[in-house]
Amino acid sequence: MSLEDDVIAIIVEQLGVDPKEVNENSSFIEDLNADSLDLTELIMTLEEKFAFEISEEDAEKLRTVGDVFTYIKKRQAEQ
């Protein structure tokens, strides 16, 4: 599985959405109907999966699925 597939699988599981609804441009709040608790749980799951901490400041910037793809790729390149 690619990074994108892994992230989408986590989003689908955590938010209970249809995989067809999830794409790079999907907004967590507007398109996927996530609330703040959903987003907190999603961030925690991403941290566990990819083995790094996401600061609260960085987490607030992750508004779309594409933002998460970009952030994780950047963090992996830094490791």
Swiss-Prot record:
Transmembrane segments: none
Subcellular location: Cytoplasm
Every Carrier domain range: 1-76
Keyword annotations: Cytoplasm, Fatty acid biosynthesis, Fatty acid metabolism, Lipid biosynthesis, Lipid metabolism, Phosphopantetheine, Phosphoprotein
GO cellular component terms given for this protein: cytosol; membrane
Biological processes per GO annotation: lipid A biosynthetic process
Family of the protein in this entry: Belongs to the acyl carrier protein (ACP) family.
Protein known as: Acyl carrier protein
Organism: Chlamydia pneumoniae
Gene: acpP
